[in-house]
A protein has these predicted regions:
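Membrane-interface helix termini and inter-helical loops of multi-pass transporters
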Residues: 25-35, 90-93, 136-148, 195-211, ...
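Glycine-/small-residue-enriched transmembrane alpha-helix faces in small-molecule transporters
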Residues: 1-37, 144-169
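Structural signature of hydrophobic alpha-helical transmembrane segments
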Residues: 34-46, 87-104, 146-159, 204-218, ...
Length: 287
């Protein structure tokens, strides 16, 4: 029986969800290990894998002069956004951190409209407004220090929006493997001195969680995402990326005995239903 490209795309998107879910679990399971140390190991694995893939493909890592600032910008925004996302995962429930992180498509749309002059229709504007409403429910704005992790989580989504917008601009100009290579390289270079300033020697279990739980799982998530969009267009498979909100809620309850509060549930419901609404709208536009 022939398996359709869409089915393959959905399969790889769900593999990506599993990878990033396992990564989130590992991040929370290592409270003793500083954030920068976790980010270093996460990107070390991606750097080694991307370098190996480029070597196997005999691909040059040279980037055209006019694209260098954009590759650097993508790497820088991606790195800072990742640090912010790890901080959010450490200090919020997995579900809340991933709800905020999944707002990045909203900021991609806004950035693409401003910088790439892409057109946004009325239904997309409605979707953006609904998503921003969801932010209020998840963050629950106040003057308390307790709101800081939520704001950092939102900041990670904004930076991811910048990063993905640059990736969209570089499409056809720079291969995705080269983007991943330089993003991972910059992250490793930036986190190494910060990690050494406050290095915590991991025990055997923590080494396993850093390399496999965070590094390999994140690579699984990243490559799953890449393959998903290789087999099927974003309009057909992107919606399945939001399954991570549900898997995160389950893992929060099963492993950490925590559940998001009512306001976060409402925010998550708005995010998922708006994502479905935009998915159906975008799919209709492409048909």
């Amino acid at each position: 029986m022939m398996i359709s490209d869409k089915t393959k795309g959905v399969f790889w998107m769900l593999i990506s969800v599993l990878g990033f879910t396992f990564m989130g679990i590992a991040v929370k399971y290592l409270p003793r290990i500083p954030t920068y140390e976790k980010v270093f190991f996460r990107n070390s694995v991606s750097f080694i894998l991307s370098a190996y893939i480029l070597y196997r493909q005999k691909e040059s890592i040279k980037v055209a002069k006019e694209n260098i600032p954009f590759v650097f910008g993508r790497s820088f925004f991606g790195f800072v956004g990742m640090v912010a996302n790890f901080y959010a995962l450490e200090n919020l429930t997995m579900a809340e951190a991933n709800m905020l992180n999944k707002l990045s498509p909203v900021f991609v749309t806004i950035c693409a409209c401003i910088f790439l002059k892409e057109k946004v229709d009325k239904k997309q504007v409605i979707g953006i407004v609904l998503m921003l409403m969801a932010v209020v429910f998840v963050i629950k704005p106040s003057f308390s220090p307790e709101v800081i992790p939520s704001l950092v989580g939102l900041f990670s989504a904004i930076l991811a929006g910048f990063s993905y917008t640059i990736i969209r601009y570089l499409h056809g100009k720079v291969k995705s493997e080269i983007n991943v290579f330089y993003f991972s390289l910059l992250s490793v270079i930036c986190t190494f001195p910060l990690m050494m300033m406050n290095f915590v020697k991991p025990n055997l279990f923590e080494v396993f969680m850093l390399i496999v739980g965070i590094g390999v799982s994140a690579a699984m998530g990243q490559f799953g995402l890449t393959y998903a969009y290789t087999f099927a267009p974003a309009s057909e498979v992107s919606i399945y990326n939001y399954v991570i909100i549900i898997t995160s809620m389950l893992m929060d309850y099963i492993l950490f005995s925590t559940i998001p509060d009512l306001f976060s549930f409402i925010g998550g419901f708005i995010i998922i239903t708006t994502a479905i609404y935009l998915y159906l709208h975008n799919k209709k536009k492409t048909e």
